[in-house]
């Protein structure tokens, strides 16, 4: 099921507000996930996971690019994210629970940076968006 028009507009407005800093916020969410949920680091043993590491920043930018792609294709997330889903589920064998944990951290980050804008409506729309993204990524796990 696709997001409602109001939710799509709300998510797109947040993305516009984040502007060129989406990578910075995605990196912060990754760092938060690694600190708060250490089990997620098992997929990244080959990276320097210290705060501010260039490798984490590079992966944060990949997350940001994937989420931006999702925002640009809100009407058909499964198709837009199919290559990413295949890589993470089939090749990397990422536990679907890790998507949930990152989703939580991605929700916290804009709330921290935009507290005045983080209304119940924005919160609900972002939860729905992230749930759709997570569902699209984890759909091959079923």
Curated annotation (Swiss-Prot):
SUPFAM superfamilies noted in UniProt: Globin-like
InterPro entries hit by this protein: Globin, Globin-like_sf, Globin/Proto, Hemoglobin_a-typ, Hemoglobin_oxygen_transport, Hemoglobin_pi
Protein name (database record): Hemoglobin subunit theta-1
Lineage: Eukaryota, Metazoa, Chordata, Craniata, Vertebrata
Domain annotation Globin: ranges: 2-142
GO cellular component term of the entry, any: haptoglobin-hemoglobin complex
Any one Gene Ontology BP term: hydrogen peroxide catabolic process
Keyword terms: Heme, Iron, Metal-binding, Oxygen transport, Transport
Keyword check for Metal-binding: yes
Keyword flag Metal-binding: yes
Gene3D superfamilies assigned: Globins
Record: residues binding heme b: 59, 88
GO molecular function, one term: iron ion binding
Natural source organism: Equus caballus (Horse)
């Amino acid at each position: 099921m696709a997001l409602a028009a109001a939710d799509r507009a709300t998510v797109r407005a947040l993305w516009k507000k984040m502007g060129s800093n989406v990578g910075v916020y995605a990196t912060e969410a990754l760092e938060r996930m690694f600190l708060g949920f250490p089990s997620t680091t098992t997929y990244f043993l080959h990276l320097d996971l210290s705060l501010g590491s260039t490798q984490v920043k590079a992966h944060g930018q990949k997350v940001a690019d994937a989420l931006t792609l999702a925002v640009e294709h809100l009407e058909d997330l499964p198709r837009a994210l199919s290559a990413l889903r295949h890589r993470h589920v089939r090749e990397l064998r990422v536990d679907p629970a890790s998507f949930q944990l990152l989703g939580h951290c991605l929700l916290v980050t804009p709330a921290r940076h935009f507290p005045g804008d983080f209304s119940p409506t924005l919160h609900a729309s972002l939860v729905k968006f992230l749930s759709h993204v997570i569902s699209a990524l984890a759909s091959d796990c079923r």
